[in-house]
Amino acid sequence: RVSGLAAQVWNFEPLYRTPFVKIGDWQFAFSETTIIYQMWEGLYWDIRFSIGEDGETFMTRFGKPFEHYIQEITCAAAKNAEEKYSVLFQNEFPYMYKGESKASSDCYFRIGNVLIAVEAKAKSPHSDTLTGVSREAINTEVNELMVDPVIQVLTRLNEINSDDNNIPEETLKFFFGVEQTIILSVSMEKVQPIGELLFDFDAQVKQHLSHTNVVCYHNISVEDYEVVCNLIENCPDELPTILTSWYKDQRVDKRSAVVLVNYLSSYGKQYV
């Protein structure tokens, strides 16, 4: 019986779809997370299904406001950071590279000599990924939400740091003197950071990281990123260390699954 239960695929999706349990006249919620998830994801799908277009068209249109939201909260956090800390913000910008039109990552911010590059993806894992039923589905979304954004950021940085672009000197100054780079891929919902998946992720991006100063990279949900923005405002000097330490703790072994809310608690920070 025990071995049978261990091998069983557990699908917790119904708890996200219907986070309340009703007993008589009382309604109970077992998790604040499932309520917040339903408010955000539920609203998204209500809007999605109210539009009689194909999913690709909707996602293309939804992507821009999602990116803009990430840019806005990052800019606001950088401006509101404690005055004694220098937090600089750089929004997305167009440029020409070897005669081709390009666009930078969605936004960047700097804390001292540490550059944090942010790439927003208006996507979330599908049901097959959330339930762990299909390894093929999981691998596809590891690529879309984790691997591809990291490679995209690295490609843009290589172009920005080359001599073959027409980027104004004033914009280029933002990237001068960077000693460490952190990459954040922000999606509607993240692929859960389980050690085994992270090791596969690392193997796929390893060759692209050679001769770079990238110290860590994460795929995080928009909710996680809002917490990151709060850290930018209140303790920006600690944020690079928090992100790099969290990166290492997630990779202790293949069973590691260190989510941000738990890690911040152990670090003495609130998930707000």
Segments from the language model and where they lie:
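Catalytic cores of nucleic-acid endonucleases
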Residues: 122-181
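Active-site beta-strand-loop-beta-strand hairpin of nuclease catalytic cores
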Residues: 109-127
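Catalytic or ion-translocation cores adjacent to nucleophile or general acid/base/metal-coordination motifs
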Residues: 66-69, 94-98, 124-148, 198, ...
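Extended hydrophobic secondary-structure segments that form protein cores and membrane-embedded regions
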Residues: 89-92, 180-188
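A short acidic/basic microdomain associated with nuclease active sites
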Residues: 77-102, 107
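Extended, charge-rich low-complexity regions and/or helical-solenoid scaffolds
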Residues: 173-174, 182, 193-202
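Short conserved micro-motifs at the rims of enzyme active sites and ligand-binding pockets
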Residues: 32, 42, 119-120, 129-131, ...
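Interfaces and regulatory segments of ATP-dependent nucleotide/adenylate/phosphodiester-chemistry enzymes
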Residues: 1-79, 199-272
